[in-house]
């Protein structure tokens, strides 16, 4: 029997990604959906119409039939007693109150930042720090909840942490410099990024983004010890920019390691991790977690955003970094709306389901 799930924030960009990605899911069945008071009481297909009657479906393809006629509820109308899990796609400051209310009764997998920086909350990337999911049991106990909140990281953190994991574990990465070239869609749709601002332009600053990347990467690569996560002993400097690309974040990364490293051994390491990655075989997992290219023109957003249906992290330009005694540099591409958002959250739920957390 499939697990019964709800999508909260179902009408927004991330909510629509959940709707699409949960279509015909072998383990999860969407039985309840919720959004703001403005959308509540309407059929889903009507809830995403603008005042002129235009359907604002942003994901591509058609709206899945399973959800068109489903009635959108308010948060208060969600019946948690009939749910096994909630996916939270709430994009506003209301996320904290909403997720707190729901987690008292049922597990919540979230794409919001509301709980990321709490001591008893792991920031989980399936395949990277699965062992930190044990902190969810401590969270339940600390807060006297029946459920828990398991957030994804910021979508810019996702690609960096995924590519840094093998370098940190095997080569003792100790310093990282990263510059991101982030897609317009990462800024959301309402209000989103102004077309006048980003067209024929690069915006060299995204508020609060760099602090998030530094803090989250160290937490994700850290170790769970005595009921707490000890952040990884790694120094991170980053510059986050917005570029005129629709979907997918590209990052230029320089890494200093404590041990000798060269491009070929790094490539071999990623290939080894591909063979043993914990999420292999899960419904939303890609065939290859990492794709490493020798072609110096890769990765590119237009070419690589659909690799592994947006769930593969693509790496290229693996080169020796001459600034360090031991170091490497590379480019990465990660799909901010797939692995970095709703579909990554579904993969996380699949991992937690296999661990009997759901």
Features from the language model and the residues they span:
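N-terminal Rossmann-like NAD(P) cofactor-binding subdomain of oxidoreductases
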Residues: 1-198, 202, 235, 313-314, ...
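Charged docking surfaces used in two-component/phosphorelay signaling
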Residues: 184-358
């Amino acid at each position: 029997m499939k697990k019964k799930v709800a999508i909260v924030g179902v009408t927004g960009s991330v909510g629509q990604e959940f709707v699409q990605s949960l279509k015909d899911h072998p383990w999860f069945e969407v039985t309840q959906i919720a959004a703001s008071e403005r959308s509540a009481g309407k059929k889903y297909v009507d809830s995403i119409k603008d005042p002129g009657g235009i359907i604002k479906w942003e994901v591509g393809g058609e709206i899945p039939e399973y959800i068109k006629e489903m009635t959108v509820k308010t948060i208060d109308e969600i019946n948690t007693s009939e749910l096994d899990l909630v996916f939270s796609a709430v994009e506003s400051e209301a996320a904290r109150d909403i997720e707190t209310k729901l987690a008292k009764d049922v597990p919540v997998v979230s794409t919001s930042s509301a709980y990321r920086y709490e001591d008893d909350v792991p920031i989980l990337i399936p395949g990277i720090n699965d062992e930190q999911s044990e902190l969810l049991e401590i969270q339940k106990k600390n807060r006297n909840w029946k459920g828990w909140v398991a957030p994804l990281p910021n979508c810019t953190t996702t690609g960096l942490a995924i590519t840094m994991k093998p370098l940190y574990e095997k080569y003792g990465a100790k310093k990282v410099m990263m510059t991101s070239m982030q897609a317009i869609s990462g800024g959301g749709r309402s209000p989103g990024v102004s077309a006048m601002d980003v067209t024929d332009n690069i915006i060299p600053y995204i508020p609060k983004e760099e602090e998030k990347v530094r803090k989250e990467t160290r937490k994700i690569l850290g170790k769970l010890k005595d009921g707490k996560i000890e952040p990884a002993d790694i120094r991170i400097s980053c510059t986050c920019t917005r570029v005129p690309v629709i979907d997918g974040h590209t990052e230029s990364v320089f890494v200093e390691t404590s041990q000798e490293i060269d491009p070929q051994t790094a490539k071999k390491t990623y290939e080894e991790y591909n063979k043993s990655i914990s999420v292999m075989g899960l419904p939303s997992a890609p065939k290859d977690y990492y794709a490493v290219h020798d072609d110096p023109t890769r990765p590119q957003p237009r070419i690589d955003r659909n690799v592994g249906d947006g769930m593969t992290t693509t790496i290229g330009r693996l080169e020796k970094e001459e600034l360090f005694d031991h170091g490497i540099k590379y480019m990465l591409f990660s799909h901010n709306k797939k692995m970095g958002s709703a579909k990554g959250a579904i993969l996380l739920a699949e991992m937690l389901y296999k661990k009997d957390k759901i």
